Amino acid sequence: MKTYSAKPSEIEKKWWVIDAKNIVLGRLASRVANMLRGKHKPSFTPHLDCGDNIIIINAEHVKLTGKKANPKDGKIYYRYTGFPGGIKDTTAGKILSGKHPERVIKMAVKRMITRNALGAKQMSNLYVYANGDHPHMAQQPTVYDFASQNPKNKK
């Protein structure tokens, strides 16, 4: 029996909507990364984009455990401007209370996806919204109840 390898024409993508209200960030990000890659499907093929499309709503209400949410000495995100001495930092608490709180989820998932062209394609299937509204009702997404899978998922 040969090992099954899916062809691009055989891949079926589903649409999922996940409510991130009071959900722990790391647990949510790791599950979403697996769903974007398609590792939850029996037809998973590593070199193809066989993952699903994920819509995350209420991203501003995601929870961080421990001291990571502390605005002063919490989890720090670094970026580099390209100039000498140009390293900038911000905390997860500042991002969540700022203008674009959905970036915390996008960064967490992006760092769990492979860093190549396939990973960029898979990240384009992730849609994160700060509030409860999303413009993807025409795709008829299925509600994915992440909070009830494990009591540790909710805080």
From Swiss-Prot:
Keyword terms: Ribonucleoprotein, Ribosomal protein
Cited SUPFAM superfamilies: Ribosomal protein L13
BP-aspect Gene Ontology terms: negative regulation of translation; translation
Keyword Ribosomal protein: yes
PROSITE patterns: RIBOSOMAL_L13
Top-level taxon of the source organism: Bacteria
One term of GO molecular function: structural constituent of ribosome
One Pfam family per UniProt: Ribosomal_L13
Entry's family note: Belongs to the universal ribosomal protein uL13 family.
HAMAP family found in the cross-reference section: Ribosomal_uL13 (MF_01366)
Name of the protein in question: Large ribosomal subunit protein uL13
